[in-house]
UniProtKB/Swiss-Prot annotation:
Name of the gene this protein is made from: TOP1E
TM segment ranges: none
Coiled coil (UniProt feature): none
The protein's name in its UniProt record: DNA topoisomerase 1B
Enzyme class: isomerase
Subunit text: Monomer.
InterPro entries listed in its UniProt record: DNA_brk_join_enz, DNA_topo_I_N_sf, Top1B_N_bact, TopoI, TopoI_cat_a-hlx-sub_euk, TopoI_cat_euk
DNA-binding among keywords: yes
Domain Topo IB-type catalytic residue range list: 79-336
Amino acid sequence: MSYDEKHLMEGIYREKSGDKFIYYYFDNNEEVTTKDIERINKLRIPPAWTNVWVARDPNSPIQAIGTDSKGRKQYRYNEIHIQGAEKEKFKRLYDFIKSIPKLEKAMVRDNNFPFYNKNRVISLMLQMVRDYNMRVGKEVYARQNKSYGISSLRKKHVKISPGVITLNFKGKSGQRLNYTIRNDFYIDGIKMLMKLEGDRLFQYISTDEDGNEKIMRVNDRDLNKYIQENMGSEFTIKDFRTFGANLYFIQALLSETRKRTPKNRKTIKKNIANAFKSTARQLKHTGAVSKKSYVMNYTLELYQNNPEFFIEHKNDDPIDFLLRILKSYRKDVLGE
């Protein structure tokens, strides 16, 4: 097995005894408790598997690992983990990534509309969400907590300097956020929006049947409606942040793998920690938040237990590799 001694000591192994298996703890070679035997039996580990390792923690997402008769590494997963919220979120993420080209086609189309057209403003906002991983924000949070996202930004949050625009505002949990924008497309767009009356940044001009014009605000519902019309009814703007977190984590993990081959537990742990730090910087939160709420546990467990897979694909395109992992997740964990 490819795990170092420390990792092995955290688990359970088995030995053949007649026509059955006996399971032992690695750290003391004692037979496992009746409670652990009941859990292991529910995993239905095939008798033909060799090099079997079973998690000692009943809450571990990966409960057992072994090698099948064809030499392939196989897994058994925690049923509670499978049934949790992560199941639906990451099942949807694969389809979300596959649907991004449809959204991008719509945004290219709408970028050609007159500037203050509603869809053109929404297109600009979604491109910023994609590139800067901004939260959507809600007007109610802006009023109650003075916390903002892209749909609730005020003009007071914008600072225009030669060749650069800075957005500075309080985000979720009171965190101070600062975005430095040097892209001419975004700079030109924000400058145009600053010319409209009102304190809100993202607004558009609506014209009624009599030709009367009115300045309207773009809200989070408008953004979600645009996404659902152009990508699919199951998606929301929050999927962008899930996508961004997992893509950045994959990019960072592959980069760390190229720097340091994960051949032992210490290197694996360091590479994962650095990848979480890098992801947190991109999303402007902490590594703990990335791990708890955004990054797929399946990727983490896969890197810990099968680093050879990442070594083999360390030069892959990150999006293609993320799709490969998501496809594997849907097959291995969700049984699709």
